[in-house]
Amino acid sequence: MSELSDRMGVERDFARRLSRLTARQRRELREKLGTPPDVTRVTAVDWARWEDERRQELTLILLAVILATYRQHVVELVGEQPDDATAAAAYREAVVKAAAMAAESAGSSISTARDIVMAAADVLRTGTAADVESVLVSALGPERDAVTAATATTQAQTAGTVAARLPVEAAGFNMVTRWVTEQDSKVCPLCRPLNGKVPDLWGLVLENALAPGGSRAAASVVANGGPPAHPNCRCYLRTTREPQARRVRVPG
């Protein structure tokens, strides 16, 4: 029914865990570049390895967030955990979702890091030590990790909420979701009009949004089943349950 318990604490732990990996990869990148730094010393194999490491770490983090959100919603809406078969089905779905999200995020992050490094080849070769470090932190650094953690926590929270639909329906209820924004000045003009809206209205609201990026956000929201609508999105889904309609058999 509510946002993931201690959502901001979960996000902070996510960012710290990811930053530990990123710091090690940045150190390895610095060593690979050599002295003076030369981007040709960093091979495609190196970038692929860093992407795979990031994918594996993200999969574990995201799976934990998805399952925590799922369990919270099931307890709030049903009052107890589902039977073994339903729980196993939800777990399989969570594993698949976490792996897909992690692969997309890791691929995007490392591709961007590589582009930054390659574009700064001249700066790396001729710049000061401070210049080199600035490029490396821009490519693999805590600021980008913080954005990843915020966005991916929201995405995983949505996945866990959506996964709760199966046990809720198995218990004889329909699960109704509504978009919820944070009630503060940081809410973006894309998400503000979505507050309180059910899924059938999300696409229409975003397609007609006055803020730029509405169509792109609509496609993302449909694919996710909810937030995030953009990087750093902090929105979530509020869930309620209602009795399933019963079909009355008319004697023939």
Could you say what each language-model-derived stretch is?
Residues 143-250:
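Acidic, glycine-rich two-metal-ion catalytic cores of nucleic acid-processing enzymes
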